Amino acid sequence: MDSISDIIYKGLKVSSRGWDRTRRYTKRYIFNKRSTNSKYLVMILAGYQDYVWDDVFKRISNFVPENYDVCIVSAGVRKEKLEKIAEKYGWSYLSTKANKLAMALNTTIKLHPKAEYIFKLDEDIFVGEHFFDELLDTYHFANNDGIYKIGFVAPVMNVNGASYRYFLKKIGCLSEYEEKYGIARITCDDDNVFKNGQSAKFLWSKSFPFDDIVNLFLNNQEKEYFTSPIRYSIGAILIHRERWNEAGGFISSGNGQLAWDELELCRFCMNSSSAIIISTKVFAGHFGFGKQKADMIPFYEKNKEKFGLFN
């Protein structure tokens, strides 16, 4: 007999996504397939922030293991430049007719039926050495630990409400940040880390030399991971196929509303007692949230060489 919590959870699953399950995938897409049926899949959601593509994709290409399948995913647009980047690096490219991010991601996973470990990256995420294998190691470490059922695993990111405080403490800049912007509150929305462009610039200024910061985290002697107590911004995550399937896939609002897939995935993790694991061994840079772009784009152009490889 189901407990009250089981009944409530089942009801939440039906109400939050039952109507949308038949629209989880789309048949209206263009797929340039170069997959190798790997059990590791990297999906890069891209199509709108071309000003960072050269550095972002060069970094991914340099650090992704050779036995991984990589697919650039565009929802609602088809970009010739992205097709050429995919061809250059031997990756697949998927473009869907509908501008629905969750549907595009689900379709990508469906087109890679052998993929068990699924990395989802946004187009404005900067990765470093051992990003993929260390994140995978953290997944296995936390899984073997047995303390938590894992929802998904993520890196420490600089511009991220769940992890920036840890980042600032690790590099010894927490007090300096709080003198400028107030308490570094762990939050996912209405705070400086989310909406203040100057805050994003500060966090990035402390992320250089980028690959030295990556190595600082790789050599971290602290506990392998911590858990996020709040909704996590899913610009860079690793999720197992079983957990993705249990969640009903990535879920859209039905009208293309941004971040709905994030909201529903975090809701699923909470309702199913699945932990959001943040690896203390992996650092990645997030360019910034929407309200921060006006300040971040000029900052990026002025400091472009620092975002490149080994700078």
Question: What is each stretch, according to the model?
Answer:
Residues D2-K58:
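N-proximal low-complexity "stem/linker" segments adjacent to membrane-targeting elements
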Residues V14, R24, S199-N311:
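C-terminal catalytic/acceptor-binding lobe
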Residues F57, A115, E129-F141:
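Short alpha-helix within the catalytic core of nucleotide-sugar-dependent glycosyltransferases
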Residues K58-N67:
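Short, acidic, metal-binding catalytic loop of nucleotide-sugar glycosyltransferases
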Residues I72-L82:
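A conserved acidic beta->alpha catalytic loop
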Residues N106-Y117:
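Active-site nucleotide-sugar/metal-binding loop of Leloir-type enzymes
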Residues A115-F126:
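Short beta-strand-to-loop acidic/aromatic patch adjacent to the donor-nucleotide binding site
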Residues E134-R241:
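Conserved catalytic core of nucleotide-sugar-dependent glycosyltransferases
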